[in-house]
């Protein structure tokens, strides 16, 4: 045998192994922005030789994780293709059938132009909440359309920009009426035909705040001296109570008794039936799911709330309003923000800080695309098929509970009920088994004539009768609701609902809105405490698979096997990441997860005979949701001081814990802290609270700094909520959806919500906090995909890179802006706070001026004035490549140069590029330019912008004008005539 040539041996030594080649296909390389060489350079800037050395310096040794995060079969990462294939196999265990179960969830056709250009479009789904209005005009307009749609269909005065779901909206309406009503009663009456899941969430919310929930026939609503009444319109079983006079008399009676009325209304029905605002409702709530948003096994969907004008300043949730910009042109913004938890804390109208913007945009665009006539046709067709189905069932010999309905029939089926239910499933149709003698059938826009005939055949076979002829039956049916209940008022008359009915028009309208906004598809969004990381396409793909999107939340268990497996695996993944023993995925938002966690703590104390424990210690630096959630959970908030370094003041904590020892329920801390540092004394904080009988709630908002490196369940936490829309890659959607799982130690596991749906003992659970057992189930595959593709080492690398990037930004900017808080060794966690107050004192330039000027550079602003007024908080995340980090740093340095020119007098203190930012194209191109700086300085402060320029569509929004002149509906087209 010939010996190998020396040159061949050398080549073989350089030849990569197959394992090397496969490793380079790892998803972590796609998710983590800085390359290995770039990370080395960044570490060099910080004075470290390795990422491990940096992490050792940042994270206190006492809490450093040593177990390597046991992810089981997901410890090793899957490639994108392998993860998709594995999840496809799991999804294939679900069975997609036609679900006519109803109960607030209906089949719907998502128009392709909306599916592709909103739900599947990163320009929409990667955007943040529009707190910076100048770069959010597109989605603000879309949400204003949503508000106008709800206002018109409900005939109310004002609507908010979506709620988490219908059940949450009902619970919020209850607390709203308690706040604003004049009644001293503690009774809230819920009609017995309200959706069961709504009633359960209302009960959960009522108990800790001392509200007594009473149920009974809607006709008895005025007999219970209730401060509020909740009616379903139409009822859960489909029935309408009577004619218009019946509804008016009912609301009049409630008002005369000192109460107020909430109507839970079906928006599609309101295209045909008199609106609740026309028969006396004070608040109208509901769900917009059937406006083009799939079942998704229960969510996410956009709930809604509309109120009378007198209640607008007490309404929870976000509200889009119209104001003017610096040039006097109309501009959209979030209005009345002083109601919200991030400002009013425990005095807020609600703890909600997540809406359902992406789903609300879809629903509003469904209305825009179909228009008033199109929606009415859909409703008329659904009703015609429902009336035809009813007539045929009567002809076969069945009795209906009500002859007045919109789309839902309750059929008296007697001893045939169970067999009929099974027979319908055998024909590919799910019905609702109400009890052992009745079946419910809810029709929707996906139902066809063939479906009606198939149902007749099932029912006829059971009755040993012949099915009727469709055409003959349909020809003889009349509308199945009272003539006086027919809607007479116009709706959706604004031009936006009457101009975009061709697909070309709609496509271009959606593109025009997206072009107005900054999202992650254009630029980094360095918002502190928000974790705006990559939402990878591979993670998003499964969301629209029919096996996930077309499953009804109340579908039989044998049709949801795949969902249960995926959910169980994700829960185990999250337990591994947090160090806790159990997780519930039910909460629809971080705020809801917080609330659930506090209810769990209360239930735990009560189970031990210590229900009197109601004091919640909260550091002064905490996020506003913390005190708002504690208040909602019936707890007394006691504030703990922070020291000059931003850490919890241990002496003050010991004092407050001892002072309230007998009644101490919990402490709520965020870790790393909201000041962006790993506090060295966190274990001592936990020990102090535990020694006084309290539980430790670790807010998981900053979990992106701990996955793989530290675990709250290991260093003393008893319960945490997570934000899957931060740490685990669910996109923010412009302000929702979100998922806020609650994770607990073993001793708290029996109290988790949603345990019954998982087949576990639910005797001690706190009750449901959202409408669906698994919350926003259809977006859970995003987090499953992320974890499966990253594996344990990849997740840890992501955390370490996030910390590296934050410290790199802080180090580079420190010579220009003071970094307010640092931990040991002068380092930060995954975010840093720049103190603008000294500069403002010297120059008059505020953090807001800098935030608005960043828009001229093509950047979204960092978080303003949280947790410290007059600051900017920056969180770059692990996904941003070094070139983007440097582009942002260069912009901030250039802005500091402009501030220096103000200080030196080269720029006027009032007439400078910062005070007038952002600059629109119209301003820069105007014939008149009277500023003391050049157009080029305004629009192109750095040369790179010439190749890549974003133009804000409006100038700086006037917040004061907007709140003083509150207008929260679509702007008349005459306002835009000048454009």
UniProtKB/Swiss-Prot annotation:
Cofactor(s) in the UniProt record: pyridoxal 5'-phosphate
S-S bonds: none
EC class: oxidoreductase
Coiled coil: none
Gene Ontology BP term (one): glycine decarboxylation via glycine cleavage system
Catalytically driven reaction(s): N(6)-[(R)-lipoyl]-L-lysyl-[glycine-cleavage complex H protein] + glycine + H(+) = N(6)-[(R)-S(8)-aminomethyldihydrolipoyl]-L-lysyl-[glycine-cleavage complex H protein] + CO2
EC code(s) of this entry: 1.4.4.2
Keywords: Oxidoreductase, Pyridoxal phosphate
A Gene Ontology cellular-component term: cytosol
MF terms (GO), sorted A to Z: glycine binding; glycine dehydrogenase (decarboxylating) activity; pyridoxal phosphate binding
Top-level taxon of the source organism: Bacteria
Gene3D superfamilies given in the database record: Aspartate Aminotransferase, domain 1, Type I PLP-dependent aspartate aminotransferase-like (Major domain)
Keyword set includes Oxidoreductase: yes
Modified residues (N6-(pyridoxal phosphate)lysine): 726
InterPro entries per UniProt: GcvP, GDC-P_C, GDC-P_N, GDC_P, PyrdxlP-dep_Trfase, PyrdxlP-dep_Trfase_major, PyrdxlP-dep_Trfase_small
Role noted for this protein: The glycine cleavage system catalyzes the degradation of glycine. The P protein binds the alpha-amino group of glycine through its pyridoxal phosphate cofactor; CO(2) is released and the remaining methylamine moiety is then transferred to the lipoamide cofactor of the H protein.
Summary of subunit composition and partner proteins: The glycine cleavage system is composed of four proteins: P, T, L and H.
Family label: Belongs to the GcvP family.
Protein name according to UniProt: Glycine dehydrogenase (decarboxylating)
Organism expressing this protein natively: Ralstonia pickettii (strain 12J)
């Amino acid at each position: 045998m010939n010996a190998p040539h020396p040159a061949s041996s050398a080549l073989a030594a350089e030849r990569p192994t197959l394992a090397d080649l496969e490793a380079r296909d790892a998803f972590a390389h796609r998710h983590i922005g800085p390359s290995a060489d770039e990370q080395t350079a960044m570490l060099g800037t910080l004075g470290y030789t390795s990422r491990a050395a940096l992490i050792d310096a940042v994270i206190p040794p006492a809490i450093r994780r040593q177990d390597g995060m046991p992810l089981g079969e997901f410890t090793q990462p899957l490639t994108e293709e392998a993860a998709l294939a594995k999840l496809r196999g799991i999804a294939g265990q679900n069975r997609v059938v036609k679900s006519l179960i109803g109960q607030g969830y209906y089949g719907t056709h998502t128009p392709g132009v909306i599916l592709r250009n909103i739900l599947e479009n990163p320009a929409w789904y990667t955007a943040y909440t529009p707190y910076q209005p100048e770069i959010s005009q597109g989605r603000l307009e879309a949400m204003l359309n949503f508000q106008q749609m709800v206002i018109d269909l409900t005939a109310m005065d004002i609507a908010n920009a979506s709620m988490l779901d219908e059940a949450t909206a009902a619970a919020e309406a209850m607390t709203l009426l308690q706040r604003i009503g004049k009644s001293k009663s503690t009774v809230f009456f819920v009609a017995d035909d309200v959706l069961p899941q709504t009633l359960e969430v209302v009960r959960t919310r009522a108990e800790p705040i001392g509200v007594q929930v009473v149920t009974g026939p809607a006709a008895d609503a005025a007999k219970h001296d209730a401060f509020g009444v909740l009616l379903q319109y139409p009822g859960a079983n489909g029935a309408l109570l009577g004619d218009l006079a019946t509804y008016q008399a009912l609301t009049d009676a409630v008002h005369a008794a000192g109460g107020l009325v909430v109507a839970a209304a079906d928006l599609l029905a309101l295209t045909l039936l008199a609106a609740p605002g026309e028969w006396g409702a004070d608040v109208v709530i509901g769900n917009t799911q059937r406006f083009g948003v799939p079942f998704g096994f229960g969510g996410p969907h956009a709930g809604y709330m509309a109120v009378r004008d007198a209640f607008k300043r007490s309404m929870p949730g976000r509200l889009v309003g119209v104001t003017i910009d610096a040039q006097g042109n109309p501009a959209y913004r979030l209005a009345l923000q002083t109601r919200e938890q991030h400002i009013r804390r425990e005095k807020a109208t609600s703890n909600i800080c997540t809406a359902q913007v992406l789903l609300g945009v879809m629903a509003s665009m469904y209305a825009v695309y179909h228009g008033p006539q199109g929606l009415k046709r859909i409703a008329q067709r659904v009703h015609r098929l429902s009336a035809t189905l009813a007539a045929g069932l009567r002809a076969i010999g069945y009795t209906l509970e009500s002859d007045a309905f919109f789309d839902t029939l309750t059929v008296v089926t007697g001893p045939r009920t169970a067999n009929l239910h099974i027979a319908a499933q055998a024909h590919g149709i799910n019905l609702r088994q109400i009890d052992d003698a009745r079946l419910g059938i809810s029709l929707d826009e996906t139902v066809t004539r063939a479906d009606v005939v198939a149902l007749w055949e099932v029912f006829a076979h059971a009755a040993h009768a012949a099915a009727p002829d469709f055409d003959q039956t349909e020809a003889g049916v009349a509308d199945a609701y009272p003539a006086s209940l027919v809607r007479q008022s116009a709706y959706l008359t604004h031009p936006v609902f009457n101009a975009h009915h061709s697909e070309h028009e709609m496509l271009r309208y959606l593109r025009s809105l997206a072009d107005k906004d900054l999202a992650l598809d254009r630029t980094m969004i360095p918002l502190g405490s928000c974790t705006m990381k990559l939402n990878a396409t591979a993670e998003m793909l499964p969301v629209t698979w029919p096996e996930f999107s077309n499953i009804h939340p109340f579908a039989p268990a044998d049709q949801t096997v795949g969902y249960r497996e995926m959910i169980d695996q994700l829960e185990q993944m999250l337990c591994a990441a947090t160090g806790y023993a159990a997780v519930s995925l039910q909460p629809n938002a971080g705020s809801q997860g917080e609330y659930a966690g506090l209810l769990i703590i209360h239930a735990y104390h009560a189970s031990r005979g210590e229900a009197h424990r109601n004091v919640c210690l909260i550091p002064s630096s905490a996020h506003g949701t913390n005190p708002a959630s504690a208040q909602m959970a019936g707890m007394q908030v006691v504030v703990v001081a922070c020291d000059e370094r931003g850490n919890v003041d241990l002496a003050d904590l010991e004092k407050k814990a001892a002072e309230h020892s007998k009644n101490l329920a919990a402490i709520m801390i965020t870790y790393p802290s909201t000041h962006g540092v790993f506090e060295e004394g966190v274990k001592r904080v936990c020990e102090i609270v535990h020694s006084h009988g309290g539980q430790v709630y670790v807010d998981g908002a900053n979990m992106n700094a701990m996955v793989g490196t530290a675990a709250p369940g290991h260093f003393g936490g008893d319960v945490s909520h997570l934000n899957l829309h931060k740490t685990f890659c669910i996109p923010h959607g412009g302000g929702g959806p979100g998922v806020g799982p609650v994770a607990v130690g073993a001793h708290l596991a029996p109290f988790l919500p949603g345990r019954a749906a998982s087949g576990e003992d639910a005797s001690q659970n706190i009750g449901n906090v959202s409408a669906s057992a698994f919350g926003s189930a259809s977006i859970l595959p995003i987090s499953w995909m992320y974890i499966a593709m990253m594996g344990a080492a990849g997740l840890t690398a992501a955390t370490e890179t996030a910390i590296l990037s934050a410290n790199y930004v802080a180090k580079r900017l420190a010579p220009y802006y003071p970094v307010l808080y640092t931990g040991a060794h002068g380092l930060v966690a995954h975010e840093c706070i720049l103190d603008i107050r000294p500069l403002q004192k010297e120059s008059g330039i505020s953090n807001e001026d800098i935030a608005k000027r960043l828009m001229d550079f093509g950047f979204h602003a960092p978080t303003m004035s949280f947790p410290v007024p007059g600051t900017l908080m920056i969180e770059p995340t692990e996904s941003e490549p070094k070139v983007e980090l440097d582009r942002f740093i260069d912009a901030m340095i250039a802005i500091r140069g402009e501030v220096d020119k103000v200080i030196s007098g080269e720029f006027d203190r009032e007439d400078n590029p910062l005070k007038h930012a952002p600059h629109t194209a119209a301003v820069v191109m105007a014939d008149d330019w009277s500023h003391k700086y050049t157009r080029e300085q305004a629009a192109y402060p750095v040369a790179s912008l010439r190749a890549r320029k974003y133009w804000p569509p409006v100038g700086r929004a006037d917040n004061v004008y907007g709140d003083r002149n509150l207008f929260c509906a679509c702007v008349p087209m005459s306002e835009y005539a000048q454009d």
